[in-house]
Amino acid sequence: MVKTAHVYGNGPSRVLYNEHTPKDNELIVGCNLIEPGINPDVIAVIDSQPIAWMHDNNVYPTAKFWVSNRSMLQLRHYEMLDRIKVNKVWDDIHRYNCGIYAVRECLNQGYNVHMWGFDSMFSDSLESPAMDKIIARHRR
């Protein structure tokens, strides 16, 4: 049986996922802060800002977490490891974004991967509409 993972990115086209009805055996992976209505099995985080936001807003999702070393340091700093279920810790890789980490992990686990909201792969769009409303970007 083919295993399917849906990686929900942050780009504008992520809304196309709203038309998909996930099957019980599909893995849903969200990147960073997940907007309401998306219920991921796994949340992938590689930066410190989403962890700080969760801490500051008392938001502790019940999904498993795949995190980078940088995010793990932030989880320890905020003493969140008793509230966040970390399932996988990745080495920090320069120029990788959260979506790349998540897709790579799914492929390494043998999943057929469907990507939603990965606009920057196919265009010059670097927008992350949902994330940008929550965490201001200082470099764009």
Model-derived features: positions:
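Metal-ion/cofactor- or nucleotide/acyl-coenzyme-handling active-site neighborhoods
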Residues: 1-140
